[in-house]
Amino acid sequence: LERGKASAEREIHIYIREGKYYLDTPLVVDAGEWKNKRLTLSAYNNEPVVLSGARKLSLKWVKQKNGIWKSKTEADKGDQLFVGGEKRILARYPNFEEGTIFNGTAADALAPARVKRWKSPGGGFIHALHARDWGDMHYVITGKDDKSILFEGGYQNNRPSNMHDKYRFVENIYEELDAPGEWFLDGKAGYLYYYPYPDENIDNEIFEIAEIPSLIEIKGIENDRASDVTVRGICFSQTSRTFMADYEPLLRSDWAIYRGAAVFIENAERCRIEDCEFTGLGGNAIFLSRHIDGCVVKGNYIHQIGASAICIVGDTSAVRSGVFKYEHSVPYE
């Protein structure tokens, strides 16, 4: 990309050879740096190319009790772990049960007797349905006192509500690491804990942990729009989860939105995302933000992701007397 920006050529085609490329920051195509150029990013000759938001870990396992192994790690963050390319389960209660709401919920997820077992739950997550089953709400645990845990969040839903008293679960808590396939990262101490499946040889597996939420950002501004960028034939994978990122309410709708994605396009014209794959993502796959004209999203395979496949969201500044929270209204005069 740096060579392309500096080139005098008007047509820039960057071919990417077969392989998996781990990014620690997103690739950014900024309108101000690509004026009057057409850019194409594509896999070379249909070779398999993966852009990953994960870090590949180098681990030396030491056996612990109760089926758990641990290893020192340089990773200090991450809430999606992949073993041999397969996503594993962040330590949770109740345990994972495929095909159920949230893959398992329990009314006693926050019961005092259970909370009392948690030595240091800060950084854990609570996931729950809206009290009237209208959607999901998410919270981060900030600590605990003598009586209960402390937490914040729930802003992903634009209809204020308590969390559901039955459909809820907790995760990312060390004391809940008790089933095959579960894991926990102690980022402060620098240890990864894992409970392998019975037939899993962890010394021979590749461990990867997702660290960034975005892989490509194509960005312009209102008076200087990004244009003529094509992304073709690339697999985007292993981004971090975004449910606790900043969310925007959208004109009294039931929901709020995280303005970001694995591929994020903002204030752009004539851009194309085609024949790509999006999988193993922690959030949105493709986001078309604010002014978008003549852009095409075509032929992509989007599966096993954490949020929406394709978002098209304008700018609320285009609305006069906008009302954002569900409970607000504009007086009639």
For each feature predicted by the language model, list its residue ranges.
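Extracellular polysaccharide-degrading/modifying enzymes targeting complex plant/algal/animal polysaccharides
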Residues: L1-R272, E277, A318-V330
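Glycine-centered loop/turn positions within well-structured domains
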Residues: V49, C271, N284, C295, ...
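Carboxylate/His-rich catalytic cores and anion/metal-binding grooves
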Residues: V229-R232, R241-A245, C295-Y301, G306-S317
